[in-house]
């Protein structure tokens, strides 16, 4: 029992760094997505989280969320704070400034 515990503790203590690749065995960056341009049955692209401006207003983004990308499906009702610029449907990113 003790040996199993130490084995599991050792396995979970090992820190792994990896690159993630989608449709590739050799990712070139931290997150590498390779499309299938010649396969018409697959749609290429990345879809970010879809959320309304009002739903986004209920969340509090800090500097650690800088660079976050969302697709606003509706503008915010009250254009203030972190949703001051969410005035129409579209892709938005958080640059750390409110």
Task: Please describe what each predicted stretch is.
Residues 2-4, 19-98:
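C-terminal trimerization/auto-chaperone modules of long, extracellular attachment fibers and adhesins
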Residues 1-12:
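Hydrophobic, helix-prone linear segments
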Residues 13-17:
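N-terminal signal peptide c-region/cleavage motif recognized by signal peptidases
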């Amino acid at each position: 029992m003790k040996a199993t515990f130490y084995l599991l503790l050792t396995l979970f203590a090992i820190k792994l760094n990896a690159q993630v690749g989608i449709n590739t065995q050799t990712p070139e960056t931290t997150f590498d997505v390779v499309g299938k341009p010649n396969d018409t049955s697959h749609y290429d692209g990345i879809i970010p989280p879809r959320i309304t401006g009002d739903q986004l207003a209920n969340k509090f983004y800090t500097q650690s969320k800088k660079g976050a990308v969302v697709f606003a499906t509706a503008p915010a009702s009250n254009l203030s704070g972190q949703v001051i610029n969410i005035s129409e449907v579209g892709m938005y990113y958080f640059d750390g400034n409110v």
